[in-house]
């Protein structure tokens, strides 16, 4: 059993999603969006991200943490803010002893939808379908759940690969 906390970072909205991986099945636990006030200074928003994620970690006790990597942004300032939001989230995870998996947006979409070029509505639809949800999750929450599902799929693939192949000095034999 592994509970994975997926996070879609942002300086104004940070999505989170928790998925339980049991016996090859994925079960929805919870999801939501941490909202910050645009009027707050960036350090205050980063504190909100950190404290909210620590609270979520303490409440749900996930065993693994997955987050989206920084991708191209509209501006250098946006990229820096996104990087700082990621940093606050990652520090919340490592402070609580969680291993961190990082995934590019294209890999997440490929893993969940089957296309790295999928749009937000396709991700929402597949997350709803894969987790048997009765309602469509908000965009940021759906992205976070997709990140958790990508992490689960990636880890399962690595375990299968390690069990079926032999490596010597880091190379496949």
Curated annotation (Swiss-Prot):
SUPFAM superfamilies according to UniProt: Ribonuclease H-like
Binding site for Mg(2+) 1: 8, 140
Co-factor requirement: Mg(2+)
GO BP terms: DNA recombination; DNA repair
Catalytic reaction list: Endonucleolytic cleavage at a junction such as a reciprocal single-stranded crossover between two homologous DNA duplexes (Holliday junction)
Annotated localization: Cytoplasm
UniProt remark on cofactor binding: Binds 2 Mg(2+) ion per subunit.
PROSITE patterns named in the record: RUVC
Complex and partners: Homodimer which binds Holliday junction (HJ) DNA. The HJ becomes 2-fold symmetrical on binding to RuvC with unstacked arms; it has a different conformation from HJ DNA in complex with RuvA. In the full resolvosome a probable DNA-RuvA(4)-RuvB(12)-RuvC(2) complex forms which resolves the HJ.
Function: The RuvA-RuvB-RuvC complex processes Holliday junction (HJ) DNA during genetic recombination and DNA repair. Endonuclease that resolves HJ intermediates. Cleaves cruciform DNA by making single-stranded nicks across the HJ at symmetrical positions within the homologous arms, yielding a 5'-phosphate and a 3'-hydroxyl group; requires a central core of homology in the junction. The consensus cleavage sequence is 5'-(A/T)TT(C/G)-3'. Cleavage occurs on the 3'-side of the TT dinucleotide at the point of strand exchange.
Protein name: Crossover junction endodeoxyribonuclease RuvC
Lineage start: Bacteria, Pseudomonadati, Pseudomonadota, Gammaproteobacteria, Cellvibrionales
Name of the gene encoding the protein in the UniProt record: ruvC
């Amino acid at each position: 059993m592994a509970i994975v906390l997926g996070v879609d970072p942002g300086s104004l909205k940070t999505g989170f999603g928790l998925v339980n991986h049991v016996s090859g099945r994925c079960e929805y636990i919870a999801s939501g969006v941490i909202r910050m006030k645009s009027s707050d200074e960036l350090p205050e928003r980063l504190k909100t991200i950190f404290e909210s994620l620590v609270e979520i970690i303490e409440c749900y006790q996930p065993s693994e943490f997955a987050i989206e990597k920084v991708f191209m942004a509209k501006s250098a300032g946006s990229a820096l803010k996104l990087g700082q939001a990621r940093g606050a989230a990652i520090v919340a995870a490592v402070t609580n002893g969680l291993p961190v998996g990082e995934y590019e947006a294209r890999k997440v979409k490929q893993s969940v939808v089957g296309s790295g070029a999928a749009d937000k509505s396709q991700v929402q639809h597949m997350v709803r379908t894969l987790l048997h949800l009765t309602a469509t999750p908000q965009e940021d929450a759906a992205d976070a759940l997709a990140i958790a599902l990508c992490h689960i799929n990636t880890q399962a693939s690595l375990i299968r690969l390690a069990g079926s192949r032999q490596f010597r000095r880091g190379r496949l034999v």
